[in-house]
């Protein structure tokens, strides 16, 4: 598999997909999305399951069916949160290089490989985190950050109550609120 990836990744990243489409096995179909010059091809090492995935699979609340599909999911590539190693980069990518350990959020995170835009939800994995730990961060942390900073307008000295402080989003909310200098009270069951 690794030799196959090395052989076809440059063609995929430069748009030579027509010559290679039949050479890519079914399990590597996500590689075909890597033809963009600003794409980062990630070999996924870990992916986490979060409520978004569960709602997507269950089709509840019913509004999810508009995106997911009425009878069954339209897209079999499930998952959002992931971590892994950069396998290849498009010719215009400057922030990442092959071998970098990264984590982020993108539909299809349960796949073996993902193509992620360089300027999308992708960043270097801290060296002190395992791949599994990093895969648990993206959606929960982004949700907490957006709620506190963007919607809540958090500021130093502000008193903040975090309901559900022991959950996925709540754990990040406590840490993020503290990093903004807020006085935090956490509530959990």
How should these model regions be labeled?
Residues 33-83:
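N-terminal glycine-rich beta->alpha transition that marks the start or flank
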Residues 106-119:
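A structural motif shared across PLP-dependent enzymes of the aminotransferase-like
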């Amino acid at each position: 598999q690794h030799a196959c990836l090395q052989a076809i990744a440059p063609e995929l990243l430069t748009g030579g997909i027509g010559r290679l489409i039949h050479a890519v096995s079914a399990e590597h179909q996500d590689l075909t999305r890597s033809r963009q010059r600003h794409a980062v091809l990630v070999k996924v090492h870990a992916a986490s399951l979060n409520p978004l995935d569960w709602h997507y699979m269950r089709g509840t609340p019913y509004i999810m069916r508009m995106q997911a599909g009425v009878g069954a999911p339209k897209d079999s590539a499930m998952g959002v949160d992931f971590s892994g190693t950069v396998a290849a980069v498009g010719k215009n990518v400057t922030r990442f290089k092959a071998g970098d350990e990264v984590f982020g959020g993108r539909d299809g995170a349960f796949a073996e490989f993902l193509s992620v835009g360089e300027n999308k939800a992708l960043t270097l994995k801290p060296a002190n985190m395992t791949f599994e730990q990093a895969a648990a961060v993206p959606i929960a942390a982004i949700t907490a950050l957006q709620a506190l900073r963007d919607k809540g307008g958090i500021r130093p000295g502000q008193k903040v109550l975090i309901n559900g402080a022991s959950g996925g989003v709540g754990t990040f909310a406590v840490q993020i609120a503290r990093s903004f200098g807020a006085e935090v009270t956490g509530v959990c069951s």
